[in-house]
């Protein structure tokens, strides 16, 4: 019995090691792709670093889950005893990709959860890092920042804060909700503007990083 359990544990460890290696290889592949092939590849290293300082990560807008690779790499590498990931998107990811990401998370000992939902209609959860890459409009990001920021302990990271959606709203999309409060200026456009206005309202947050490459990537830090 003892020998059987030892062999079983060894088999599980071998499988976990293989998945850990595969996660690293998949991350490296996407992180090395040029902007023409991957619109967030150049920022995976930032997500990895920020997640490396976090116990709980929330991702709003998972898309093809490439960004999730960076977050899982960081969670896997940190020394925290608690490691949790929550992804939220209006669309269900490709089943094969989602299953593979889930396996990667399990091998990294990350408590993994995906929710199919409108992020403006769910209750925010406390987290160390919030990453946002959803509908690229001023009003959408403004509402997300106001709703989720009170629950964020350390960092808020956002993609697409430079060209083309830094100063323009993404066209051809129906607003997720029409219940916009009166204090949102209906003439404002773009994610950069949404970030700047959020910072003006919330002195408890400061801009830590602003990268202009690969459509832009901005990091806010709680002070």
Regions found by a protein language model. Give the residues of each.
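Boundary at the C-terminal end of the N-terminal hydrophobic targeting segment
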Residues: 10-12
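S-adenosylmethionine/decaboxylated-SAM
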Residues: 17-223
């Amino acid at each position: 019995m003892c020998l059987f359990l030892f062999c079983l544990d060894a088999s599980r460890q071998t499988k976990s090691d293989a998945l850990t290696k595969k996660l690293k290889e998949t991350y490296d592949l996407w992180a090395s792709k040029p902007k023409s092939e991957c619109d967030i590849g150049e920022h995976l290293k930032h997500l990895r670093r920020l997640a490396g300082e976090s116990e709980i990560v929330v991702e709003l807008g998972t898309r093809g889950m490439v960004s999730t690779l960076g977050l899982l790499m960081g969670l896997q590498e940190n020394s925290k005893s608690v490691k949790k990931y929550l992804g939220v998107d209006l669309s269900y990811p490709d089943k094969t990709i989602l299953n593979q990401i889930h396996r990667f998370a399990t091998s990294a000992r990350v408590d993994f959860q995906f929710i199919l939902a409108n992020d403006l209609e769910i209750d925010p959860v406390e987290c160390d890092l919030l990453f946002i890459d959803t509908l690229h409009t001023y009003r959408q990001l403004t509402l997300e920042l106001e709703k989720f920021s009170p629950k964020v302990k350390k960092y808020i990271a956002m993609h697409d804060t430079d060209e083309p959606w830094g100063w323009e709203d993404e066209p051809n999309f129906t607003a997720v909700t029409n219940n916009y409060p009166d204090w949102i200026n209906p003439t404002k456009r773009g994610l950069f503007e949404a970030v700047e206005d959020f910072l003006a309202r919330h002195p408890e947050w400061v801009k830590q990083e602003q990268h202009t490459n690969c459509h832009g990537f901005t990091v806010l830090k709680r002070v």
